[in-house]
Amino acid sequence: MSTSSFERSSNPTLSQWQRLLKNAGTWQGSFAQISPVGEFLSEVRTEVELTPSDEGKAMHQEVRRYPADAPPQVQILDYRSLNRATLFFENGAFSQGSMQWGPFSSFGAELGLIAGDRRLRLVQLFEKNELRPLTLIRERKQGTEAPERPALSLSALVGTWKGKAVTQYADLRPDTYSDTQLTVEQIGPTQIRQTIRLGADSPPLSSTGQIEGSQILFKEGMQPVQ
């Protein structure tokens, strides 16, 4: 499992639990349902509260949903450990989901990014081999004025993006790091080309995508990607 980051922590020896604690606080935002083709379906206001207790050895978690036409819904969790299906990165970013997948079962994952007083999470679920509606969760810490970023446009995506890739392993061996570079070019009214470099010694990987509404479809490989 990998994630890209522009900052590396000064303390890469934090335990998984210590990395979880970087998410402590009350996060206010919304759960938005988006169709597999990028169409907005619905949105509900939410609060997620993560409160450490017992000198940081336990976590109390409350998820509060506020539907427009129904009473508030509250889910409460208390835990002292993390399962193997959840992995946290140095800055508090995380991934959790199914340890195995297959074409005849239900599976999915939640990907969470954190930057200062903002969090962005995405839940992807598959029913057998079909992608279900996505859940996009945009949050900011209670009491802050972290601005909402505008919706991503194609013109904002075009360019060269440099960063660091952090790879984490399920057996909890040390994280590995490599430089990354992604170049996105628009090569026609409805086409883009992306070129990815992972490390200085790796050959570039290029693919061409077709722009269709809110989607960019990459159909060249054995596994289509959007």
Q: What is each residue range found by the language model?
A:
Residues 22-36, 154-171:
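Tryptophan-anchored aromatic micro-motifs
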Residues 39-45, 103-105:
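Amphipathic hydrophobic-ligand
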